[in-house]
Every structure is written in structure tokens, then in C-alpha cells.
Amino acid sequence: MNTILRTLLFEWKDRKLPSIIERDIRLDTSSQQKINNATVITGFRRVGKTYMLYDAIKKLFETQTREEVVYINFEDERIIAPTTDLLTNLIPEIQAIYGQKPKYLFLDELQLIPYWSKWVRRMLDTESLQIFITGSSSKMSSAELPTELRGRAWEIKVTPLTLKNFYALKM
């Protein structure tokens, strides 16, 4: 599993971000209040949760380096039968590859990893970083947010495009 994790981290170093359509809602990555709290982005499939992460990452790249901002998509087909070890090794692998710990972690579809919420809680308690998580609303909502994260996570619900966004896309 470490080989896959290393591959994903090396690929991230050179990955180009896709074009992004601005939405009415954007992630706030500047607030120091978010350290020791996670931001959980939920919504139906294909409503733009991942692109919301990309938008925030693109904005962060104006002041931060790739080594400080790390994105991992846990829906990657190379992550087969994931275990908690994948998460346990994440920060040490990032540090080994990039030479430093990240300031921002963007974890797409994290709910696919067993015991993910316990790991996030440990990171919030022991590391100084901002964590952004996406998950489909059928698997991760405020009503179903694990008890480990209650009071430690802000939820942002993403809805389908507004009519204004839709027209902007078509223009």
C-alpha cells in the first residue's frame, strides 16, 4: 500500500489542475480557526465537491507550494482494499517525499478508508494542519458524521449548479 501512496504523492507533484467554474460557494482556507478542525464537504455525486477542492487548491498555490498543499483521491482504482495503514503512513510518506509535513490536506472520498474518522481526529489533535474532506452525502452527512468528529468538523453541503452558474457555464 505504501507503493501506491508514494506513486500518488509523486504524481501530485506534477499534476495540472483542471479548469474550474467559479461557484457561489468557495472554501475558506485562510482562517487559522480551522486548524484543529476539519472541513467536510458533502453532497450528491457529481455536484462539484472535487472541483471545490481544486478551486481552493488553486487559490492556495498563489501563496503556498505543492509540498505544503497535498491532494489525494481515495477513489483512485489503484487503491485496492484500502486499510487504515494507508492513512497511518500518509504524513510520514509526505514528509519523506516532500521533505516537510503538509499545511493543507485535501482528502477526496475519504469515507472509503476504514476508520478514517479516528485518523482525522488524531491528526487534528497532534498535527498543525488544515484538513478538507469530501464525501457523498449518502455516506457522509452531518447526521452520520462520526462521533469522533462531532464538534471538530464543519460541514459544507454542495448542491447542483444554480441557474446562474449553469448559464455562466453555457456562455
Question: Which role fits each region the language model picked out?
Answer:
Residues 1-171:
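Phosphate-binding site recognition
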